[in-house]
Swiss-Prot record:
Species for this entry: Staphylococcus aureus (strain bovine RF122 / ET3-1)
Subunit structure: Heterodimer of AddA and AddB/RexB.
GO CC term, one of those recorded: DNA helicase complex
Molecular functions (GO terms): 3'-5' DNA helicase activity; 3'-5' exonuclease activity; ATP binding; ATP hydrolysis activity; double-stranded DNA binding
HAMAP family: AddA
Family membership noted in the UniProt record: Belongs to the helicase family. AddA subfamily.
NCBIfam families in the cross-refs: addA_Gpos (TIGR02785)
Lineage, broadest ranks: Bacteria, Bacillati, Bacillota, Bacilli, Bacillales
Gene: addA
Name of the protein in question: ATP-dependent helicase/nuclease subunit A
Length: 1217
């Protein structure tokens, strides 16, 4: 069917129009970010219904997520309703209103499930099957692996013994089990898992495949060797500019001869490379050269730098790719073959037994969905079954969204139900391989790439390819800068895609013509002398400053009204690779009172509160695990100090487990009695929880732990309290889900959690903030995919790529299989094998490529403005990045492959055209004006030193404040002196009014009202004169002797004023240390200690009120205030006979948005015979009712917020008002 002619005035671009109507062959639409992909997909579905008369239930629409499926179905339904209203007599449209509910617009998993439900008889399974929970599936697989390994231990095949010696330690086979699980998940992502496993051994047995691996390494080596040769030649050229360096030139000449031999004939001579030494040491530099002119000194530095680069590149090739002779590598492969074959056998046994267990329980998992669907749709020979043919007849078109995230099993399923070949098929695919960022979920971007390269624009003889390149989301500055970065960063070699004219973004949004350049901010860290903050904390602080700047100066353009509005919090998103920076950002935003939310369902198990709960569970399950036992002891729950742990271990240094050391310490007569009591209480708790766990489900054990130690309350009061609370509840809810499976017990639950951690699965914070809440958001790049924001701050650019998987002894790859290091069992030594070296190199290339795609996703989220935040320790590293080598239009391949982080690439690309000091051979273009508008960068690069812009509040960690900490004024500033003298000599013009007493204390008002309420006929005193008596130095600060009750009261208040609230209860020993600190600071006299009522303070420390204050979000001590009494009493503002109230509140704290005040009382009271505590409490409340009411009203007047209060009596306890 031909594409209809596009009418004038339609909203669709030519490419979109063709994507909507193209038919008659398989179609692949490469839809760049912001190009309207979803709108095109919906319109294509609608036109199939309206124009072609196809029923909606005869289309199969496959989406990546259930949410996308629901949104897609809703959009289609809305369009059908609109069309039906416009044409009410259309019977076809009325029919679609009914059929939309049966329409197959879903994820592929949902389609597979429906297929199984309809054809379960083919599979010979019970139709009453259910889908296993995540907990049940994980634990069942763990159990299966355990049983299969145990069976093979009984067999003790020599290959199995070698495997266990290579992949297990003397204490654990965890690594061995992990590799089995990884191989299982890799295998089931293939249409025929057994066949994939059988082929793992092929490279180890067949020389032809080994030759292919050698070629992979040779090709990679050529990249680095060529770069090394270039660096060597540059070093030679630079040394040639100098005098007195003949010896240096001779050394380099020798190196050039060696390198010429390696590169002879355009091929890499690997035997020659591995058989010779390279990188001879250069002679020492003479003083004459060092003292030459500045240009020569710079040339010398550059020459040495280039020679050093040459050596490092050669070393990389020899150490990473060819550390051993090729023949030795091949010999190792032959010895590894039996181990690889046996490992595949174990995985097949696991697969078979796992499937048997699932069938016995009548459960299916998501992998079963796909493989059972394939079983239904294919015959034994792999050809489509009769059922597949019936689906081919039924579905008139198959539409696949996010095709770049498809795996090979899903591709096979689609091929079974589509009609025709590529040149006459009915498969419509939409996606963007530049946004393929789910390789960890076994997504295979090569499926998209292969089709994109095979399909043509006109579709002659094959499928048809279309490019949606016009972006309707972002300003042109964002697009052109993004294009410039990727034009020089991404190609087929690194990135897997050529970022050419068809791949780049073209401006299509109707913004105004104002200039909004991209901002690359490079933060130079302050060292410890200039800031107490870590580098990450400095970056978080700097990000907050950027947010404040956006809110103050930036506007958001409304395309519909063509007008601007002020930026709000929700317009701003902070994107990072992971959530490692979340807590620092939360603290930084909290310090500035900016609403901030971490949109996190990742990084869950890294959170402090979750680690504490898991340490508790692990210690209860097995207290012989030192890491978790000690972690629990050091936590806020038990508060053991490092020196206490040291005392315990020193007494029994040879114990295998710390638990043994604890028991031995308790039983030692020389042990510290206080520490022994603390340890006994700790062990008593452990044993009590262990007993409880035997008779109660895990979720009840977690709940008891939370309640016993106020865990929820404590973490709710910290930074990010809502999220922390959600995390703790998330663990509790997961335990409930676990109990609903067929597994029970603490041990099994911990295994379930360990499996989630290992697989990178998260179930973290609940969504405590809605999409329309006005807060600044932080999210990962993965979670931002598909979203857009006016202002994007892409930070964490300097955080290195996570290459942890590359260091494993076994490397897995969907295309190549398994690369296992060689392990010499006799010598107990491991060496890289040919397969592990080659697959590791391939994996590193794929990792860097995916990281590039993550950068692309991050940059293309921005609508109005994009901020890139990098951080370095010093500016010297920037010069090295500016001089990064290039090759043609790209950063050199070797530089890209070894780039440690995104900043390394982004800065080196964007800085080249802005630096005048960079030679032409290191620039992409001599004149940036020559670059086309669509890829000409519009970027401001700012180098910022943190100490120059920091407005951080320097917090004194000292708990104490001394009365004599005064600053001295420096001499020499006469203007300042004159200003101060003028202020001191100033005569107040209304001096007579000062004789009118107008200031009253809250305590005085209390006495006045007590007089009035007692019935005294005295007229209310409106003027209370504060006497002119000299204030004496308190006796507890001066003379020794017996103190009066009021002096002791003042002393107690002083102690309480400085009492630390460290979110934990301090011990009596720590209290004495704290009092001694007050004495050392001269806040109280040494002899005052005997009059401090330690028992009463300890009672307060152990009270609930102390715990509440410790968990507060903010705490203020000894807060003075002065307020107009008219406001407090709600008197008319014109009343001139109104006084000013002044007072001092002992303590204020903020918890859950509510302000509380605390007033300490040292009063004694009369307990009449028979009086209950409740009656005494009422009496005390009444006594201070007036004063407390004024405190409450005053604070509410000042803060304009709800205020509550507490009275604390040292001789009675807490009273809440």
């Amino acid at each position: 069917m031909t594409i209809p002619e596009k009418p004038q005035g339609v909203i669709w671009t030519d490419a979109q129009w063709q994507s909507i109507y193209a038919t008659g062959q398989d179609v692949l639409v490469a839809a760049a970010a912001g190009s309207g992909k979803t709108a095109v997909l919906v319109e294509r579905i609608i036109q199939k219904i309206l124009r072609d008369g196809i029923d909606v239930d005869r289309l199969l629409v496959v989406t990546f997520t259930n949410l996308s499926a629901r949104e897609m179905k809703h959009r289609v339904d809305q369009r059908i309703q609109e069309a039906s209203i416009a044409d009410p007599a259309n019977a076809h449209l009325k029919n679609q209103r009914i059929k939309i509910h049966q329409a197959q617009i879903s994820t592929l998993h949902s389609f597979c499930l429906k297929l199984i439900q309809q054809h379960y008889d083919v599979l010979n399974i019970d139709p009453n099957f259910r889908t296993s929970s995540e907990a049940e599936n994980i634990l069942l697989l763990e159990q299966t692996i355990d049983e299969v390994i145990e069976q093979h231990y009984d067999i003790l095949d020599p290959a199995f013994i070698e495997l266990t010696e290579q992949l297990s330690s003397d204490r654990s086979d965890d690594q061995f089990r992990m590799i089995i699980k990884q191989l299982y998940f890799f295998s089931v992502a293939n249409p025929n898992p057994t066949n994939w496993l059988d082929q793992l051994v092929t490279p180890y047995e067949e020389e032809a495949q080994q030759a292919q691996l050698i070629q992979i390494l040779t090709d990679l080596s050529k990249v680095f060797i060529t770069a090394a040769y270039d660096a060597l030649n540059k070093a030679y050229d630079l040394f040639s500019m100098m005098d007195g360096v003949d010896k240096h030139l001779a050394v380099i000449e020798d190196e050039r001869r060696l390198m010429g031999r390696v590169l002879e004939g355009g091929f890499i001579d690997i035997p020659y490379l591995t058989g010779h030494e390279f990188g001879a040491r250069l002679p020492n530099i003479t003083a004459k050269i060092k003292e030459a002119n500045e240009m020569m000194v710079d040339a010398l530095k550059d020459a040495k730098l280039q020679y050093k680069k040459y050596k490092s590149l050669i070393d990389k090739v020899k150490s990473d790719y060819f550390s051993r002779e090729a023949d030795d590598l091949k010999a190792d492969m032959q010895q590894l073959a039996p181990r690889v074959k046996y490992l595949a056998r174990i995985v097949k046994d696991v697969m078979s037994e796992f499937n048997r267990k699932k069938r016995s329980k009548n459960i299916l998992d998501f992998s079963d969905y796909e493989h059972f669907a394939l079983q239904i749709l294919t015959n034994e020979d792999g050809s489509p079954s009769e059922i597949a043919e019936s689906y081919r007849q039924h579905f008139q078109e198959i539409l696949v969204d996010e095709y770049q995230d498809t795996n090979r099993v899903q591709e096979k399923i689609l091929s079974c139900i589509k009609t025709g070949d590529e040149h006459n098929g009915n498969l419509f695919m939409v996606g963007d391989v530049k946004q393929s960022i789910y390789k960890f979920r076994q997504a295979d971007p090569s499926l998209f790439i292969e089709k994109y390269q095979r399909f043509t624009i006109d579709g002659d003889g094959t499928g048809r390819r279309m490019d949606l390149s016009q972006n309707f989301r972002s300003r042109k500055e964002v697009l052109s800068t993004t294009n410039y970065i990727f034009k020089h960063m991404m190609d087929e070699q690194v990135g897997e895609v050529n970022y050419d004219e068809s791949a780049q973004l073209y401006y299509g949004a109707p913004y105004d013509e104002s200039d909004h350049p991209v901002n690359l901010k490079v933060l130079i860290e302050a060292d410890q002398e200039h800031s107490d903050l870590t580098g990450s904390e400095q970056e978080a602080h700097f990000i907050v400053e950027q947010v404040k700047d956006i809110l103050e100066h930036q506007k958001v353009y409304d395309m519909k009204t063509r007008s601007y509005r002020s930026a709000t919090y929700k317009d701003i998103v902070i994107l990072e690779r992971s959530f490692g920076q979340a807590r620092n950002l939360q603290q930084a935003f909290k310090n500035e009172d900016i609403p901030f939310h971490v949109n996190s369902r990742e990084g869950y198990f890294e959170q402090t509160e979750v680690r504490l709960a898991l340490s508790f569970l692990r210690a209860i399950d097995n207290p012989l695990q030192d890491i978790y036992l000690v972690g629990l002891m050091r936590s806020v729950i038990y508060q053991f100090k490092e020196d206490e742990l040291a005392q315990i271990r020193i007494l029994s240094p040879n114990d295998d487990y710390f638990y043994q050391s604890i028991v031995n310490y308790i039983n030692d007569e020389a042990a510290d009695a206080i520490l022994v009591d603390k340890l006994k209480m700790f062990l008593s708790d452990i044993q009590s929880y262990q007993q409880y766990s035997k008779d109660h489900p895990v979720y009840q054990l977690i709940d008891k732990f939370y309640n016993d130690h106020y865990v929820i309350q404590y973490f709710s009061g910290l930074i990010g309290g809502r999220g922390r609370r959600a995390n703790l509840y998330g663990l509790f809810n997961k335990a409930i889900e676990f109990e609903n499976s067929s597994f029970r017990g603490l041990y099994q639950f911990i295994r379930f959690i360990d499996e989630l951690i290992e697989r990178g699965k998260d179930f973290g914070e609940e969504n405590v903030v809605g999409p329309n809440d006005n807060v600044v958001r932080m999210m990962t790049i993965h979670s931002s995919k598909g979203l857009e924001f006016p202002f994007v701050i892409y930070s964490g650019l300097s955080k290195d790529f996570n290459k942890r998987d590359l260091k494993q002894p076994v490397i897995l790859n969907q295309q190549f299989g398994l690369g296992m290091d060689y392990f010499d069992v006799d010598k107990e030594m491991a060496f890289p094998s040919l397969a592990s070296v080659a697959y590791r190199a391939v994996a590193e290339k794929e990792l860097v490529s995916e990281e590039m795609r993550l950068v692309y996703v991050a940059l293309t989220r921005a609508k109005e403005q994009l901020y890139l935040i990098g951080r370095v320790k010093n500016d010297k590293s920037l010069l090295e990045l500016e001089q990064l080598s290039i090759s043609g239009e790209h950063i050199a391949v070797n530089e890209r492959l070894t780039s440690p982080n995104p900043f390394h690439l982004i800065y080196s690309i964007l800085s080249k055209h802005q630096s005048a000091s960079i030679p032409d051979d290191l620039k992409f273009e001599k004149d940036i004006a020559q670059v086309e508008d669509s890829s000409r960068p519009n970027v401001n690069i700012s180098i910022i030193y943190f100490e120059d812009v920091s407005t951080e509040t320097i917090l004194d960690n000292d708990e104490y404040r001394s009365v004599n900490q005064l600053e001295t004024m420096q001499n020499g500033n006469e203007d300042v002196k004159a200003q101060i003298k003028h202020q001191l000599d100033y005569q107040y013009p209304y001096v007579n009014d000062t004789k009118k007493p107008s200031k009253q204390s809250v305590s005085e008002l209390k006495r006045q009202y007590e007089t009035e309420e007692s019935g005294t006929s005295y007229e209310r005193v409106r003027q209370y004169r504060i006497g002119f008596s000299t204030y004496e130095r308190p006796k507890f600060l001066s003379e020794q002797g017996k103190r009066k009750a009021n002096e002791i009261g003042t002393l107690m208040h002083t102690v309480m004023q400085h009492l630390p609230f460290k979110k934990e209860r301090i011990s009596e020993v720590e209290l004495h240390q704290y009092i001694d600190g007050l004495i050392d600071k001269h806040i109280i006299e040494a002899d005052a200690k005997k009059d401090i009522r330690m028992d009463e303070i300890m009672t307060f420390i152990n009270s609930e009120l102390y715990s509440i204050i410790a968990e507060a979000e903010q705490v203020y001590r000894e807060l003075p205030f002065v307020v107009n009494q008219a406001l407090v009493d709600q008197l008319p503002q014109g009343d001139e006979d109104v006084s000013i109230i002044q007072g001092m509140i002992d303590l204020i704290f903020v918890k859950d948005g509510v302000h509380y005040f605390v007033d300490y009382k040292t009063d004694a009271f009369n307990r009449r015979r028979g009086m209950t505590d409740e009656e005494i409490g009422t009496q005390l409340k009444n006594k201070y009712k007036i004063q407390m009411k004024y405190y409450q009203n005053t604070l509410q007047t000042i803060l304009n917020k709800e205020v509550k209060g507490y009275l604390y009596f040292f001789k009675f306890g807490t009273l809440q008002l």
